[in-house]
């Protein structure tokens, strides 16, 4: 089983750790976070306002974080180059600070003995992989990869199924996205993105997202055919993608439902879900799929122009894909 270090014990770092313990697919052996001491880590891992209390045991013992009886080495280094991943036995590192997202910056982990780095965010220059879409293109010459964004992980599997069957001529995506840590609780300064600094709990905030364009990186045939934007809304978790696209081949809405349902039960099982229930966002909290197609919410104007709706737990679904990508990479060693 691949031995993993986690850099940055924030929302994604903690939930990747949860996903690892829930699934038993990878072995977390080390965690680095300069801003959270050991006893605070115990507390933050045990209690989660969004996903509830951890079902298991968590304690501090002999300077280590012990989860379900497993001792995890703790580092508190600010510079990734100084983290001794090798000493802790970690061969893969999940880079989940949100800070070191380029090949050069994430590459610092290799100095401490890590063999590979998985960036849990989009990257300007690291190759991006989306499970179920282009993960087969991974080869073990790559030392640093990106798991793309939560929104790209929601959109890409759906876009792939639609494009494979009907062809996407062009499309626009909107994600109605839950609050994340980069937003402000009340109005505050926010660099160049003035709107992003407005109070998260009070507003619907139009924002930019590279998620749709990134689909063109993981599905090259769609490069230049998709773009999109986001609305940040005052909910703590779970987001929804609205993909409005023009189809090459004519398709009845029922035809679209059929192919998505087949994909959800076949090649994309566990990644792309399908529901005909009258669901709302809360129903997907702690859901492990990358994307769940909402058959009842979509609409068709005609056989060539459709609006498709897909839900995602932007925290937990994504964190589970980080684990799955590491398992896939390990299978190629």
From Swiss-Prot:
The keyword Phosphoprotein applies. SMART domains: Gp_dh_N (SM00846). Its main location: cytoplasm. The modification S-nitrosocysteine is found at residues 150, 245. The modification Cysteine persulfide is found at residue 150. The modification N6-malonyllysine is found at residues 192, 213. Glyceraldehyde-3-phosphate dehydrogenase activity is inhibited by fumarate, via the formation of S-(2-succinyl)cysteine residues. The modification S-(2-succinyl)cysteine is found at residues 150, 245. InterPro entries: GlycerAld/Erythrose_P_DH, GlycerAld_3-P_DH_AS, GlycerAld_3-P_DH_cat, GlycerAld_3-P_DH_NAD(P)-bd, Glyceraldehyde-3-P_DH_1, NAD(P)-bd_dom_sf. The keyword NAD applies. SUPFAM superfamilies: Glyceraldehyde-3-phosphate dehydrogenase-like, C-terminal domain (SSF55347), NAD(P)-binding Rossmann-fold domains (SSF51735). Disulfide bonds: none annotated. Homotetramer. Interacts with TPPP; the interaction is direct. Interacts (when S-nitrosylated) with SIAH1; leading to nuclear translocation. Interacts with RILPL1/GOSPEL, leading to prevent the interaction between GAPDH and SIAH1 and prevent nuclear translocation. Interacts with CHP1; the interaction increases the binding of CHP1 with microtubules. Associates with microtubules. Interacts with EIF1AD, USP25, PRKCI and WARS1. Interacts with phosphorylated RPL13A; inhibited by oxidatively-modified low-densitity lipoprotein (LDL(ox)). Component of the GAIT complex. This is Glyceraldehyde-3-phosphate dehydrogenase. It comes from Sus scrofa (Pig). The lineage of its organism: Eukaryota, Metazoa, Chordata, Craniata, Vertebrata.
